[in-house]
Regions:
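Phosphate/oxyanion-binding active-site loops and adjacent basic polyanion-contact surfaces
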Residues: 29-37, 84-88, 125
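Charged, low-complexity C-terminal accessory regions
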Residues: 179-267
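Charged, often low-complexity linker/regulatory segments
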Residues: 1-64, 229-267
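Conserved catalytic cores of phosphodiester-cleaving nucleases, focusing on short active-site segments
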Residues: 91-93, 105-118, 136
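Active-site-adjacent loop/helix micro-motif of nuclease/hydrolase catalytic cores
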Residues: 116-129, 155-156
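Surface-exposed intrinsically disordered loops and tails
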Residues: 52-76, 175-185, 219-228
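Active-site metal-binding core of divalent-cation-utilizing nuclease and nuclease-like domains
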Residues: 56-107
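Nucleic-acid nuclease catalytic cores
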Residues: 125, 134-218
Length: 267
């Protein structure tokens, strides 16, 4: 199924250094779900890696003039009036290409924050988010995913591992040069792999995409996420896609435009 409509209107372009969201500092300090979710979609590299995991081949085939329109934390009934569960949609993501909304590839994500600690790495989450994801499937969204965004403290340095640092000599051939060995806290990798394994084991529906992402607060660098591609929901209808489009047309200024490629600079 492929269903597209004209974009008609575009949100304002947010460039590097622009203010995208104003977040209450109290929410940031307590690592609230909304604060972390907003910070996550502002990290365009990390967001893009997660989107690629969830949408697979579709992402790889997106062209030069393509991207995604992201709307965080929506009251569900504002999109589908008769919808009551879940009460909100954490992320609504509409891809576009060449000024066309690709509505049949719209993705909704149920977000859960996993607060891990070194001394309790084995602890399972109280909720996985699958009941909400099943509600999103029943409501007819074309693609549905559950995302666990993981935060943690650091491991004691005695538990850090040796890792190699390399530099790229030739990007085309893939040739690298090993530089040195350093000590690195690799707990984020363990947390993501363990968290993803739990998601896979507990997932009740193969249509639900799965994503385990580590979010490094106030630290440099990103960790590549673990994920499984979402599958098309056969309960999706053109009527639902039209409602998604109508919501975008009425609220487009509140969406974040994240392009797949940087804009082409004109001479």
């Amino acid at each position: 199924m492929e269903y597209k409509l004209p974009m008609k209107v575009k949100p304002p372009v947010k460039k590097d250094g622009d203010i995208i969201f104003h977040i209450d500092v109290k929410l940031v300090n307590k690592a609230d779900e909304i604060a972390l979710g907003l910070q996550y979609i502002c990290n365009r590299y990390l967001y893009g890696q997660g989107y690629r995991k969830l949408m697979g081949d579709f992402f790889d085939k997106m062209g030069l003039h393509s991207g995604t329109l992201i709307k965080p934390f929506i009251i569900s009934s504002h999109v589908i009036p008769q919808m009551s569960f879940p009460g909100d949609i954490d992320f609504l993501i509409i891809p576009y290409e060449n000024d066309q909304l690709i509505l049949s590839k719209a993705l909704v994500i149920e977000l859960k924050i996993i607060r891990a600690k070194f001394i309790k790495q084995q602890k399972s989450p109280n909720e996985y988010g699958f009941s909400q994801a099943k509600g999103l499937i029943e409501s007819g969204f074309p693609y549905v995913a559950v995302m666990h965004l993981i935060i943690s403290d650091e491991s004691p340095q005695s538990h850090w591992r040796d890792v190699l640092i390399a530099k790229v000599v030739d990007a085309k051939s893939g040739k690298i040069e090993l530089i040195e060995t350093i000590k690195k806290d690799m707990m984020p990798i363990s947390l993501m792999e363990r968290g993803f394994g739990r998601l896979v084991h507990n997932c009740p529906d193969e249509r639900i995409g799965l994503l385990a992402t580590y979010f490094a607060q106030e630290k440099a660098g990103n960790w590549l996420p673990c994920g499984k591609e979402a599958k098309f929901n056969d309960k999706c209808t053109v009527g639902i896609l039209d409602k998604i489009a109508e919501y975008y047309y009425q609220n487009y200024t509140t969406f974040l435009d994240t392009r797949k490629y940087p804009p082409i600079k004109k001479d």
